[in-house]
Amino acid sequence: MGKLLLILGSVIALPTFAAGGGDLDASDYTGVSFWLVTAALLASTVFFFVERDRVSAKWKTSLTVSGLVTGIAFWHYMYMRGVWIETGDSPTVFRYIDWLLTVPLLICEFYLILAAATNVAGSLFKKLLVGSLVMLVFGYMGEAGIMAAWPAFIIGCLAWVYMIYELWAGEGKSACNTASPAVQSAYNTMMYIIIFGWAIYPVGYFTGYLMGDGGSALNLNLIYNLADFVNKILFGLIIWNVAVKESSNA
């Protein structure tokens, strides 16, 4: 039934997916990146939901969340690519709506992967959720012109650093130390994505809003699209890999 609903949902989405494009210029690399990421997100969503049948019960929720992350992003990318191709404007509102839903889910994955293998306090999830929301809210305020770009950038980066601390040296790391080697390996890899993969976002913000006349919506969106590809899809694949390994050893 789950697979049937997934296929049905994909079929329903296809007309909208096909209609929101217009002509794509071969030299518009940002537009091409929108299309590539959209297709990759859909493929990843199908993959994660189908692969739920391969893992044990305690890992199914993690794969479900991975599928939700890529599925929600796919839906918003259908609209974002349309805005870009038709107007050439940065789809800031659509992008932040997407991030407001998917970034807390990505953060939730850290809690879920630890909860599946060891005991972890619920306070960790609350801290990470607050940190992610602060990062997103101030990022949006800076991009939307609600507040000055530099202060918003600094506050957002501080929230990101706070989350890294909690995961690298705080409650998250303490819980990870009691998990299996496979879970620890996955956790550490996810940490590197949070540190280096998420660093792509402030690079995009800086390029688009803090470089004066040198900034451009083209560079901003190309960088953001790359970041979403890495952080949403690769993140989920790491979860899938450890889930399959742990399930086969059970």
UniProtKB/Swiss-Prot annotation:
Keyword Membrane applies: yes
Modified residues annotated as N6-(retinylidene)lysine in this record: K232
Signal peptide positions (record): 1-18
Subcellular location: Cell membrane
Quaternary organization: Homopentamer. GPR protomers assemble into a pentamer around a central pore with a C5 symmetry axis.
Membrane topology note: Multi-pass membrane protein
Residue numbers marked as site, Primary proton donor: E109
Effect of K58A: Reduced GPR photoactivity by about 30%
GO biological process: phototransduction
UniProt organism field: Unknown prokaryotic organism
Topology Extracellular: residue spans: 19-29, 88-90, 145-147, 209-218
Annotated site (Proton release group): E143
Site features described as Responsible for spectral tuning, chain residue numbers: L106
Functional note: Light-driven proton pump.
Cytoplasmic membrane side: 54-58, 119-121, 178-180, 250
Family label: Belongs to the archaeal/bacterial/fungal opsin family.
Name of this protein: Green-light absorbing proteorhodopsin
Listed Gene3D superfamilies: Rhodopsin 7-helix transmembrane proteins (1.20.1070.10)
GO cellular component, one term: plasma membrane
Major site of localization recorded for this protein: membrane
Keywords assigned: Cell membrane, Chromophore, Membrane, Photoreceptor protein, Receptor, Retinal protein, Sensory transduction, Signal, Transmembrane, Transmembrane helix, Transport
